Structure formats: C-alpha cells, structure tokens
Curated annotation (Swiss-Prot):
It is found in: Plastid, Chloroplast thylakoid membrane. Keywords: Chloroplast, Electron transport, Heme, Iron, Membrane, Metal-binding, Photosynthesis, Plastid, Signal, Thylakoid, Transmembrane, Transmembrane helix, Transport. Belongs to the cytochrome f family. GO terms for molecular function: electron transfer activity; heme binding; iron ion binding. This is Cytochrome f. It comes from the Eukaryota. Residues 1-35 form the signal peptide. InterPro entries: Cyt-f_TM, Cyt_f, Cyt_f_lg_dom, Cyt_f_lg_dom_sf, Rudment_hybrid_motif.
Length: 320
C-alpha cells in the first residue's frame, strides 16, 4: 500500500510536466504556422490598395512574376478552378530566420469579385480534390469571403496552387449580376525583407548608418556581426548590428560612405501580382445563342435543299 502511494506521488509531477510541454508545443506551432498570412491580415483591412498595389509588396521588395489561369466564362452556382502559378528556380536556397539556408516557401492572395467564394468541400469533385492536395485556404476576413489567402507552403510541392471557387447565383444573390469581372492575384516565393513594424529581416542587405572608418568587427556567438564605425563628422562610435544570414562585404580599417552596403543581399525570392477577367454567364443567353445558331444552321440547310430542288426543276424543264 505504501509503495502504491509513493508511485502516485512521483507520477503526478511527471504528468504535469508533460501537459505543460504539450501546451507550449501547440502554442508555438500555431503561432509559427499562422505568422505569414497574419502579417497582412492584421495590418490591412483590404489587401489591395486604391492604387491597385497589393500590400504584400510592402514586405517582399523584389519583383517576381506570377500567373493566374481562370475560365473565360462560368455559369451561376458552378465550381471552377483558379490556378495560380508561382515560378522560381528549385535549386535556389533562401536564408532562414536562424541564418541557415533552406528551401523557399510560397504563398498567394486571391481577390475575387463580390459574391465569388471558396467552394464548400461537398461541392468539390474528387478529381479537383486530388489536384488541391493538402492545401488549406482561409478567408482574409470573416466578412470578406471573396478574398482568399494561402501559405506559407513548401515551394517544391506547391509552385502551382489550385483554388476551388464557387460562382454566385444572381437569382439567389441580388448583388450578383451577369457581367465581366476582374480577378486579382498576388504571389510570393521566399521570405520578406521587412516586417510589418518596419524592422528589417535577415533576408535583406544592411547598409552603413554613418560615414567613416570601420574600427572593429565583432563576430557574435550566435551568428551575425557587430560593426563599429568611427563617424567622420564628429568621431563618435556608431555600432551597426548585422543578424546572421547576410555575408559581410567590408573589413576593419575600411573607409565607408553613408548607406554603403555592409553586406550582400541574400534575398532570392520576391513578390508579383497579376489579374484576369471572368464572365458570369446568363444560362438564358447561352440557350438563346444556341437556339439562334441552330436556326441559322437549319435555314442554311433548307436554303441548300431549296436551291437543289430549283436546279432539278430547271433541268427537267430544259430536257422537256
């Protein structure tokens, strides 16, 4: 009986420690996985500015291509594919937050017309689900279902992202109309150069904050550098901190100018945006067009038959 009580006394703190570790793991993993889309979602009510610029370009400074493919026209209440392509060289490696090199992630924002939204799972065909893979999409805001974000996801696997989209039905939604609509897309590969608070990441070039002579370069224990500069104007010491990742371009005793690059630019990624157009087609118009084409075809057939009949009559009269 005494042994059993002793075991219970030992078991209780072990279980408590395991629970704490699990909670810490869940919290850290959640914050890491949600960090990238939240940057834009928390800072901007709308990802597309009045100028047409998508706000992701504020953090991803390099300009890179992106492509979108959608059908020319869709019928109401129909699920269709919007394919976003984010090309880049798969051999490239980016600087990670710890200064080491790793693969590039990709992400995208898709700005659809009002009324268009992510297709519900029960409306997506098995073939489309297979193309989508394990991707998980989310709305930019709970009240903005027409704006979708995805990422970061591994670029090696998802350089082509398929969005399953449900078109609106004007018969059910009064604000939907049979018109031609624009679709906007933004896509990035790799990490950004600036954080939303304006601070630099380690995936960008670092410049001198003063002109003068480099008196000391201290290599930090956890990586990165501390560069001391004797200001040429007043002789005071200015210290520039370089995080791990960028490669140093200067040396001790070197004279430098204000804003001169102290490091290389390690960024190999970038952001791009594009647009496309889609027509929400009225089924009655399609039926009317088909009826018109059928009528024209039948009229041409009857005209040919009538002509042949007339030629036969003329031929018989000539023979008579």
């Amino acid at each position: 009986m005494q042994n059993r009580n002793t075991f219970s006394w030992v078991k209780e703190p072990i279980n408590r420690s395991i629970s704490v570790l699990i909670i810490i793991y869940v919290i850290t993993q959640t914050s890491i996985s949600n960090a990238y889309p939240i940057f834009a979602q928390q800072g901007y009510e709308n990802p597309r500015e009045a100028t047409g610029r998508i706000v992701c370009a504020n953090c991803h400074l390099a300009n890179k291509p992106v492509d979108i493919e959608v059908p020319q026209a869709v019928l109401p209440d129909t699920v269709f594919e919007a394919v976003v392509r984010i090309p880049y060289d798969s051999q490239l490696k980016q600087v990670l937050a710890n200064g080491k090199k790793g693969g590039l992630n990709v992400g995208a924002v898709l700005i659809l017309p009002e009324g268009f939204e992510l297709a519900p799972p029960d409306r997506i065909s098995p073939e489309m689900k297979e193309k989508i893979g394990n991707l998980s999409f989310q709305s930019y805001r709970p009240n903005k279902k027409n704006i979708l974000v995805i990422g970061p996801v591994p670029g090696q696997k998802y350089r082509e992202i398929l969005f399953p989209i449900l078109s609106p039905d004007p018969a059910a939604k009064k604000d939907a109309h049979f018109l031609k609509y624009p679709i906007y897309v933004g896509g990035n590969r790799g990490r950004g150069q600036i954080y939303p608070d304006g601070s630099k990441s380690n995936n960008t070039v670092y410049n001198a904050t003063a002109a003068g002579t480099i008196t000391k370069i201290l290599r930090k224990e956890k990586g990165g550098y501390e560069i001391s500069i004797a200001d040429a104007s007043d002789g005071r010491q200015v210290v520039d901190n370089i995080p791990p990742g960028p490669e140093l371009l200067v040396s001790e005793g070197e004279s430098i100018k204000l804003d001169q690059p102290l490091t290389s630019n390690p960024n190999v990624g970038g952001f791009g945006q594009g647009d496309a157009e889609i027509v929400l087609q009225d089924p009655l118009r399609v039926q009317g067009l088909l009826f018109f084409l059928a009528s024209v075809t039948l009229a041409q057939i009857f005209l040919v038959l009538k002509k042949k009949q007339f030629e036969k009559v003329q031929l018989s009269e000539m023979n008579f």
